[in-house]
């Protein structure tokens, strides 16, 4: 469990389906791109993203589980994202699944 973006104080509690804040969308996209490009160090060094990172991950407790998943990734694993959306403006519900196609047919 976890969230790429998890900023409860910034949430729009009255509108679950409001548009994501610009910073939350940018950060979520940055991390997803790092996952797709198999660049886990960018996810580890998320704080290099400055204010977008500080706003998106004000405390890392909900972000750290993602790093365990990336650390368990095998060569050839293909990431998929489902669900993949941001609720309340600042709460990413993006989940990452890694699959190894060559093992699925074995």
Go through the PLM ranges and name each one.
Residues 1-106:
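Surface-exposed, charge/polar-rich loops and edge strands
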């Amino acid at each position: 469990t976890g969230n790429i973006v998890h900023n409860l104080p910034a949430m729009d509690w009255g509108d679950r389906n409001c548009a994501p804040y610009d910073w939350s969308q940018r950060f979520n996209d940055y991390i997803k791109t790092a996952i797709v490009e198999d660049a886990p160090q960018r996810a580890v060094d998320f704080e290099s993203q400055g204010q977008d990172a500080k706003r998106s991950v004000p405390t890392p407790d909900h972000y750290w589980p993602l790093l365990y998943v990336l650390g368990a990734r095998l060569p050839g694993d293909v990431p998929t994202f489902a669900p993949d959306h941001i609720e309340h403006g600042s709460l990413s519900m993006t989940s990452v699944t890694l699959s190894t196609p060559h093992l699925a047919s074995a």
